[in-house]
A protein has these predicted regions:
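GH16 jelly-roll
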Residues: 23-312
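Classical Sec-dependent N-terminal signal peptides that target proteins to the secretory pathway
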Residues: 2-23
Length: 312
């Protein structure tokens, strides 16, 4: 029995070492930045446009529409608009250069995605029709899609009340569900030491599997690694190398998916979850009032040190 057990343990260890030895890095960005020229003619170190784009979809409605036509921001009642200097017009209306907001800055510690209040003139230029949508922020979407692998992000979360950073995946077929949430953070109030993670399968495959996980450290105080191990059989989430959650892989998640990183602000889940105000989508005045309560917390940054995808 001992010999057999030793053989099993040794074999498992050997296979794990082989995985470490032969795992191939198929995507990597440590955000050193490239010198990118914008439509305005300005040049700046920026996330590599060959690796990332800055909205949910290429070439479709900007900046608030999801792949199947659902208006995602309105669905969540989020209070930000995702923008970039590459966004020069909306619905054929030109955005003046001096009103364009740029949420991305590369510094020594990584890529900063900054959320801040927009001026009234900026909100008009970005056609933010909802009275509560007062913030400008940023989103990254990987141009490449992936099928299985180890997906890692090292990041430091913002402390600002109402912030809702996320690292997640959606199918390359641009449908929803399914969705894999590697983390959703609200590193303030009662969730300062927790993050939310899990999966949302297709409706025919069962209920969403997600929960808050307490990791015992304030996620806004330092950088931490959030990792997903994704195989045809199982999906597992890790925090700083320790497994936190596990789920069987639904059939809808056995196909290529792309990566999203974003910094959302407010919305009914965030406000209700953290008790700013009782919020629902039928009362936009409440969302506007919530914005007034949290607005002194901004600008605030999500800082990303690296994103790496390795083969299994």
């Amino acid at each position: 029995m001992r010999l057999k057990l030793f053989y099993i343990i040794s074999s498992a260890y050997f296979l794990s070492r082989l995985t470490l030895l032969y795992a191939e890095t198929i995507f990597e960005d440590k955000f050193a930045g490239l010198n990118v020229t914008f439509p305005s003619g300005a040049t700046k170190r920026y996330p590599d446009p060959s690796k990332w784009t800055f909205t949910f979809l290429p070439g479709t409605k900007w900046p608030d529409s999801y792949g199947d036509g659902i208006n995602w921001l309105n669905g969540n009642d989020e209070c930000q608009t995702y923008v970039t200097p590459f966004l020069t017009q909306i619905k054929g209306v030109f955005i003046p250069r001096d009103l364009r907001y740029d949420p991305f800055t590369i510094k020594k510690d990584g890529l900063h995605i900054r959320a801040q209040l927009l001026s009234e003139e900026q909100r008009q230029a970005y056609q933010t029709e909802a009275s509560y949508r007062r913030f400008g922020s940023g989103m990254l979407r990987s141009r490449e899609s992936f099928l299985y692998g180890k997906i890692r992000l090292v990041a430091k979360l913002p402390k600002a009340r109402g912030s809702w950073p996320a690292f997640w995946m959606l199918p390359a077929s641009f449908e929803w569900p399914p969705e894999i949430d590697i983390f959703e953070g609200m590193a303030w109030g009662k969730h300062a030491k927790e993050f939310h993670a899990g999966i949302i399968p297709k409706n025919t495959e069962g209920k969403p599997e997600g929960a808050w996980y307490n990791v015992g450290t304030d996620l806004s105080e330092d950088f931490h690694e959030y990792k997903l191990d994704w195989t045809p059989y199982a999906i597992a989430g890790f925090f700083d190398g320790k497994q936190i959650w596990y789920s069987k892989t639904p059939n809808s998640m056995k196909k290529p998916m792309y990566i999203l990183i974003n910094l959302a602000i407010g919305g009914k889940w965030v406000c209700n979850e953290l008790g700013i105000l009782p919020i629902d989508s039928r009362k936009p005045k409440r969302l506007k009032e919530a914005n007034e309560i949290i607005s002194d917390q901004y600008p605030s940054d999500l800082i990303i040190k690296s994103v790496i995808v390795e083969s299994l």
